[in-house]
């Protein structure tokens, strides 16, 4: 386990000197441990490139396994802590930055001491499940889970158009809660980038309606999208549920409404706090349902 940690340190630090400093050991000691690791595995893990030690293809192939071993060791240590204390420690939840700021953080605040202490790990939309191989105890994902994880559907969060109450779009709607996509596309839009699931929902809906995007800017930070809308610089299309000082509209075209972003909670089967995580996921689903009313 220690040698796996040393190999990862070298891979992530780039040089033996930097890895040794990171690990708090001397460079000769690290070099000896790495050579011993090679001998134990009977594999060539390192090659010289001038004065630099670089990883071979065999070493790089071992890195995912090393990461899993260290993550499992950390989880085992935390499980022991739980058994000693009799209660779950702080649990780590991986999710996209938007999900964290608009849903998870408000949920943590509202739930208070009724749930175990939760902390968040920001991750990208399409790599969220990878966090379960690392430090995350639970993930909130906008993409479907695989069969290898335990999961609970949380519902769908709608993509809506948001403007300040004084915006011409809000004034002309006269209290209506919907806006035609064709009319919406006459405005400058502020959209999430194509690295987000919500942008895929937007593009698919507009394309299916036979329309195309006009002037727009892209940003993956929800606070900035809200700021652009409040400043009257653009109409924000986003999954924020209840942004202050903005009014929202459901987007329609040809009698069809734009879809939402489906969310799912997932965790590893057999997790030491699996029962608590399932209960948290259920409460989180109820929180989302209540926020959408």
Regions found by a protein language model. Give the residues of each.
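A short LG(V/I)-centered, amphipathic sequence patch enriched
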Residues: 38-55
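Central regulatory/effector-binding core of bacterial HTH transcription factors
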Residues: 88-146
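Secondary-structure junction motif
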Residues: 169-181, 187-209, 273-281, 291
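Alpha-helical linker/hinge and terminal dimerization helices associated
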Residues: 40-41, 62-86
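Short helix-boundary/capping micro-motifs
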Residues: 8-26
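A late-sequence structural motif
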Residues: 251-293
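Acidic, Gly/Pro-rich loop/turn segments at junctions of secondary structure
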Residues: 122-186, 241-242, 246
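Hydrophobic hinge/microswitch elements
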Residues: 124-128, 135, 142, 195-252
